[in-house]
From Swiss-Prot:
Superkingdom of this protein's organism: Eukaryota
GO BP terms: aldehyde metabolic process; carbohydrate metabolic process; daunorubicin metabolic process; doxorubicin metabolic process; lipid metabolic process
Name used for this protein in its record: Aflatoxin B1 aldehyde reductase member 2
Modification type N6-succinyllysine: residues: 236
Keywords, comma-separated and alphabetical: Acetylation, Cytoplasm, Golgi apparatus, Lipid metabolism, Mitochondrion, NADP, Oxidoreductase, Phosphoprotein, Transit peptide
Tissues expressing the protein: Detected in brain, liver, small intestine and testis, and at lower levels in heart, prostate, skeletal muscle and spleen. Detected in kidney proximal and distal tubules, endothelial cells lining the Bowman's capsules and some cysts. Detected at low levels in lung and pancreas (at protein level). Widely expressed.
Enzyme active site: 77
Family: Belongs to the aldo/keto reductase family. Aldo/keto reductase 2 subfamily.
Gene field: AKR7A2
Organism: Homo sapiens (Human)
E.C. numbers: 1.1.1.n11
Pfam families: Aldo_ket_red
Residues the record lists as binding NADP(+): 72, 171-172, 197, 226-236, 250, 318-326
Locations listed in the record: Mitochondrion; Golgi apparatus; Cytoplasm
Site (Lowers pKa of active site Tyr) location in chain: 105
Amino acid sequence: MLSAASRVVSRAAVHCALRSPPPEARALAMSRPPPPRVASVLGTMEMGRRMDAPASAAAVRAFLERGHTELDTAFMYSDGQSETILGGLGLGLGGGDCRVKIATKANPWDGKSLKPDSVRSQLETSLKRLQCPQVDLFYLHAPDHGTPVEETLHACQRLHQEGKFVELGLSNYASWEVAEICTLCKSNGWILPTVYQGMYNATTRQVETELFPCLRHFGLRFYAYNPLAGGLLTGKYKYEDKDGKQPVGRFFGNSWAETYRNRFWKEHHFEAIALVEKALQAAYGASAPSVTSAALRWMYHHSQLQGAHGDAVILGMSSLEQLEQNLAATEEGPLEPAVVDAFNQAWHLVAHECPNYFR
C-alpha cells in the first residue's frame, strides 16, 4: 500500500504529466524563432552641427554595417545641413533598389506652418537636399494649432499621390489628435499615418498611459526619441553644471538647450540617476555597465516597445565613438531584475514632473 507521502507524489506526477505538453509540442515551441527585436533608427540631428560631413559619413557607414537601415532627419535639423550631408553620401536614397530608408519632417516653427503650401515647400526642399525623388517616411513634426488639420492631411494626400513619400508619420501629437487624424484620413480615403515618433525613456514614460493604447488600436508603430533623456541618462552631468561649467551638448550651447533643460534638468532626475547607479554597482560590482548602456538595454528589453509591432529606438550621437558605444549596448541582453526595479523606482521619483509628450 502506498504511503500518504507516496500518494501525494504520485498525484503530483500525474498532475504534471497532464499539464505537460507532448514532446512534439515542446519541440515546436523550441523551434519557433525568437520574437522580432525592437529596431534601431539613426538620428541625425547633430549632423552639420557637432558632426561635419566626414564624421557623419563614418557614422552612417558604421550604422549600416551593423545591419540597420533606417535614417531619421528633419527639415529643421542644423538649418538643413543634416539633410544636405545625407544627400551627399551617395546612398541612392529614395531609389527602388536602395536598402536604406530615409525619414524627414515638416514643422510649424520659425515662420513656417502646416498649411498646404508650407508642407509642400518643406518636403520639396528636403527632397532637393537629400537628392532623392521620394522619402520613405514623411512626418508632421508637431501640431500646427493655427491650421485646420484637414487642410494639412489633404495636402499630404496630394503629395503622397505625386509619389513624394511612401509612409506618413506623426510626432508630438496628443493621443486624441492621433485618433482624430486617423478617423479623418479613413473617412476621406486619405493616406493613414503608420508611425508615431515620440519622447520615451526609462524616466520619461508618459506615453505608456494613453498614447500607446491609442497607437495599438489604430495600428501605428512607435519610434522613441530621447532614449537617453537628451544625454542626462549617461550619468555624465551634475545638477550644479547649470550654474558652472555648462558642458557643450544638448543642454548648453545651442538653440534647443533651454528646451532640453526645461524637459529634464531637474533635481529629482539627478536623484533618480544616482539610484540607478547604486543599483548597477550592487548588481554587477566591478563589471557594472554604464548608465548609458543600462538605459538603452532598458529600452530594448524592459520597456513597452515591441518588435512585433515594428517599434524602434532612435539613436542619436555627437561622435562616431558615441554611436559605436550605443550600438554595442543595444546588442547586450536584459538587465538584472534589481536594476529594472531601480529604473521603476526612478520613474516613480520623477513621474510627477514628467514632460508632456505632446506639444
